[in-house]
Amino acid sequence: MGKAWPCGERLVRCLTGEPVDRVPFGVGIGWWPWGQTLYRWRSEAGRPDLDLVRDLGYDPSFASPAVNGGLFPAFEHKVLEETPEFVVTRNDRGITLRDRRDGMSMPEFLDYPVKTPQDWERLKTERLRLGDPGRVTEDWDAFRARLKRTGEAVQVGAFPYGMFGTPRDLLGVEALLTAFYDAPEMVRDMMEHLTGLWISAWERVAAEVRIDHIHIWEDMSGRQGSLISPAMVEQFMMPCYDRVADFARAHGVRVVSVDTDGNCGELVTLMTKHGITMFFPFEVQAGNDIREYRRRFPKLGILGGLDKRALAGTHADVDAEVERAAWMVRNGGRYIPGFDHLIPPDAKWENFRYAAERLKAVCFGG
């Protein structure tokens, strides 16, 4: 496998199919628990100070400079209602939601900031201005010193920023889906404006450091596939993806990724034609099999794709997922092992510890 690579270069080389000394370990959403899960694990381990990075030896992920790709200024965070079990808030993205206090599940989304094209125009003018100097606030001397010290690779783009994902955040999923028919010009303007806003911020980053990874958060799939038709994806979204791909080529960015839950097969087929080089998390219960994706897309970077439900089962269930990961590493690489989303509270600490031990051996070539 050759020389030992810095952690960031190892990440990028692994995802782009270049030789590496070993596969990165503990990188991605599939290595992290829900709050209630971590509470359970600390109890089962008898370790109230259990720290997964420290105790399991996770590798560093990407380093992200301070770039605000969302509402600026943000909405004021407000608590609207409280009960012993729930709290209702309006968050800094203007979304009203009801959350469990124990952090055991996703929140319930109650209201969104955009209901009409007029709301969008006002929000665009007041909180989504292009070129606002306050969007990039990184201390570049300190950031470059960090990169020199740690060897991390640089990422721009993050949750909750994507051409579908952010409009969904502004409108709500049902309202966005109907807006493709009822207000298509608003939807198109949202996507085009946001893309321009992000690229203008990334240009400022690229003037200071090398960007290694652009991430786009979409979350636009369900069990049956994409929430909008491939034709709509092509018509509304892909011109924006092409702009991102142009930026990536101009600045030598080697990894461009999309995060979408659910069955992502249609989107992988389409988006890899428009500059996307990596996908995650490949939820198994939605019908994704990363081995089949590897056969169909030999140059696709893949992160995750191991069934988190195995962690509620037996060691034999875990072993089957470890073998899935080992097959991926043996057959073409461009793969970083991980589970297929955040780890739910039914996962046993012993199973997760066992899985981490076995997957670490896969990553290190054992």
Question: For each predicted feature, which ranges?
Answer:
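Active-site loop segments of alpha/beta catalytic cores
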Residues: 1-42, 87-90, 99, 103, ...
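A structural signal for short, hydrophobic beta-strand segments that form beta-sheets
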Residues: 76-81, 85
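Segments that shape or occlude catalytic/ligand-binding pockets
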Residues: 34-77
